[in-house]
Amino acid sequence: MSFQIEYYTSAENKNDFIVEFTNFPKVLYADNNKINKLPFEIESLYFKLHHLTHDFFLIKENGVVVLRSMICLTPFPDLAYFGLLDFDYKNVKVKNILSEFKKMINSWCQIQGASKIYGPINFSTWLPYRLLSSVDGGPMFSFEPDRPIEYCQLLKEVGFTTNQLFSSKGYEELDTIINLYQSDYEKALELGFTFEFFPKELDLVDMKDLHRLSLKFFDDNYLATPIDFDTFRTLYASQSKKDDFTFSLFIKSSDGERIGYFINFIEHDYCVAKTIGIDKNYRGKGLSNGSMYLSLKKAADMGISKTVMAMVKEGAQSESYGRKMKHLWVHLYEILELSIA
């Protein structure tokens, strides 16, 4: 069985390669409106993003693309990522296709000196990453990986293993947690802390504070890397076109300094709790609980009775919020890994 691999770095006509690479998911999922198919102008930007050694490649059978992906080195020693992965998962030869993918990964990583590869991660965890691996009820949300669940299953069947597990969990009975955390909110006010809801559109000062705090909060997060301000602002602007962030808020110290935030929004009649971050010098004062109280109360006052604890690393402290409410459903996601032979 013969497959052909084409690399961007060795392509004679790089513009044609970019068009073919970005067009593949549009062709593969032409009849599936649940799959996010980015316009060429957006996806082609990936070819200008990464400053470390990387490449893009296509696997073809008889001249027809059956898989696309990128591969890159990372700031972490001996570690590479694969990402932007799409493949013809319904193809009767799909395991042969993925075996060729593994072979290509092994060869590239051996040449570059990487001993392990994680993915899918589109260059960094600031950009889309993870695969959907399990759905136990509940609606699908815009922040979730949208590739078919078969991707994760099939990659495992050819030798990839779970590196890290994440979950989104749906709950109802918001009143329980609102009542429970009201005292934390009131205590925070007594200590001089204040909470400031996001405006409809963040100005330059707001964005710089959000960027500054994010770099500080995520520095110790799994696979965290820095992000420059312009890229951060572009990503936020793109997301804010889809989601209403006016339920989100900044947390301010008694001297008016922004020292934390709680990012959340409404989707499918759920209040989606996305990210809570507090400066480590102010932790242990109930500020996370206080911000949860204020945002969830605002949602409840509008008739929202359910919440999602979104994209949480399994075993993280933030999982504890859900133990106070009635559990409805869970969606699981994974980062996969492959040791280089």
Where are these regions (language model features)?
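Acyltransferase donor/substrate-recognition loop-hinge adjacent to the catalytic core
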Residues: 2-9, 145-220
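A conserved beta-strand-loop-helix scaffold within acyl/acetyltransferase catalytic domains
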Residues: 18-61, 66-78, 202-278
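Surface-exposed, active-site-proximal loop segments in enzymatic domains
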Residues: 77-92, 127-139
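A short, internal acetyl-CoA/4′-phosphopantetheine-binding micro-motif in the GNAT/acyltransferase core
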Residues: 83-95, 122-125, 275-284
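Conserved acetyl-CoA-binding loop-helix of GNAT-fold acetyltransferases
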Residues: 93-107, 278, 284-297
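Active-site/acyl-donor-binding loops of N-acyltransferases
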Residues: 124-177, 247, 261-266, 272-280, ...
